[in-house]
């Protein structure tokens, strides 16, 4: 499988994310606690209260360069709730990237979706990698991981801004 070489936790990949300022601003989370969701929608059908600490993260379009290979028309959004709030004020946040956002045939080594974990609560950046490895060693299906140094360009705002080292986690989907 072409993606096997990518999922190598002894290598640090190089990612560069770029999008317009308008798309960057569109990525801001819509917080359901601030009245976006009507009160009635916070109840389940059985009348119990729903989780009210969830944020919706809009998708934005941009481009991603992975190890020198440029991909246009990718979709990017933040992910997480507690982790998102923990990293408030920082450019380094957990993200989900869909490489086939505008072109359903686009991928990188057969990979269509990437989960970028910032590791805000893990200074070692090894917990996800070790945990998933341990599951696989025990015979339990678990996503593969690798690392990437990520930079960001928002023209007029950030130019090749270093976001940091991320853990990249395989998307659990049909091809998993």
Task: Pin down the residues of each PLM region.
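Phosphate/dinucleotide-binding and metal-coordinating scaffold of catalytic cores
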Residues: 1-176
């Amino acid at each position: 499988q072409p993606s096997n070489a990518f999922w190598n936790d002894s290598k640090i990949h190089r990612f560069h994310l770029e999008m317009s300022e308008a798309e960057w601003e569109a990525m801001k989370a819509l917080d359901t606690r601030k009245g976006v969701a009507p009160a009635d929608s916070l109840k389940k059908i059985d009348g119990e209260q729903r989780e009210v600490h969830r944020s919706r993260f809009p998708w934005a379009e941009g481009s991603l360069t992975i190890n020198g290979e440029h991909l246009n028309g990718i979709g990017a959004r933040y992910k997480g709730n507690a982790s998102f709030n923990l990293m408030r004020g920082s450019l380094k946040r957990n993200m989900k990237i869909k490489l086939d956002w505008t072109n359903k045939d686009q991928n990188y080594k057969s990979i269509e979706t990437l989960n970028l974990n910032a590791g805000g609560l893990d200074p070692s950046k090894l917990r996800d990698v070790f945990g998933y490895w341990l599951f696989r060693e025990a015979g339990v299906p678990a996503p593969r991981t690798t690392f990437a140094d990520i930079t960001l360009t928002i023209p007029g705002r950030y130019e090749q801004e270093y976001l940091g080292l991320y853990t990249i986690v395989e998307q659990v989907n049909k091809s998993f």
